[in-house]
């Protein structure tokens, strides 16, 4: 199990990223628009830099929904390989069958 504080920190980052997503996208669009004057683009860049660091999506870490483990994460299932193996062997994941040949 991961530390509860690490999982909570990641959850706070997710909420903050959702809260600032529209504002961040609008500022990035202004910064990338070559048709805008340089002063306006620079001002938008400064506003973007003034936003909280944790409002960026790149600060979010993919973590297992079951254990909170940050590594060996399957995006499609939102869980780690260890949790996948345990739940799969218990038959709790539909369609997952232990292979044998």
From Swiss-Prot:
<dbReference type="GO" id="GO:0006412">
    <property type="term" value="P:translation"/>
</dbReference>
<dbReference type="InterPro" id="IPR018271">
    <property type="entry name" value="Ribosomal_uS14_CS"/>
</dbReference>
<keyword id="KW-0689">Ribosomal protein</keyword>
<dbReference type="GO" id="GO:0015935">
    <property type="term" value="C:small ribosomal subunit"/>
</dbReference>
<dbReference type="InterPro" id="IPR023036">
    <property type="entry name" value="Ribosomal_uS14_bac/plastid"/>
</dbReference>
<dbReference type="GO" id="GO:0019843">
    <property type="term" value="F:rRNA binding"/>
</dbReference>
<dbReference type="Pfam" id="PF00253">
    <property type="entry name" value="Ribosomal_S14"/>
</dbReference>
<comment type="similarity">
    <text>Belongs to the universal ribosomal protein uS14 family.</text>
</comment>
<protein>
    <recommendedName>
        <fullName>Small ribosomal subunit protein uS14</fullName>
    </recommendedName>
</protein>
<keyword id="KW-0687">Ribonucleoprotein</keyword>
<dbReference type="GO" id="GO:0003735">
    <property type="term" value="F:structural constituent of ribosome"/>
</dbReference>
<dbReference type="GO" id="GO:0005737">
    <property type="term" value="C:cytoplasm"/>
</dbReference>
<keyword id="KW-0694">RNA-binding</keyword>
<keyword id="KW-0699">rRNA-binding</keyword>
<comment type="subunit">
    <text>Part of the 30S ribosomal subunit. Contacts proteins S3 and S10.</text>
</comment>
<dbReference type="InterPro" id="IPR001209">
    <property type="entry name" value="Ribosomal_uS14"/>
</dbReference>
<comment type="function">
    <text>Binds 16S rRNA, required for the assembly of 30S particles and may also be responsible for determining the conformation of the 16S rRNA at the A site.</text>
</comment>
């Amino acid at each position: 199990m991961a530390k509860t504080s690490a999982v909570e920190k990641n959850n706070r980052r997710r909420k903050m990223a959702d809260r600032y997503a529209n504002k961040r996208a609008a500022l990035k669009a202004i910064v990338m628009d070559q048709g805008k004057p340089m002063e306006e683009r620079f001002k938008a860049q400064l506003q973007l830099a003034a936003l909280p660091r944790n409002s960026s999506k790149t600060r979010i870490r993919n973590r297992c929904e079951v254990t909170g483990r940050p590594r060996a994460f399957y995006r499609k299932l939102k869980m780690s390989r260890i949790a996948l193996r345990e739940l799969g062997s218990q038959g709790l994941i539909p369609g997952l069958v232990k292979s044998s040949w």
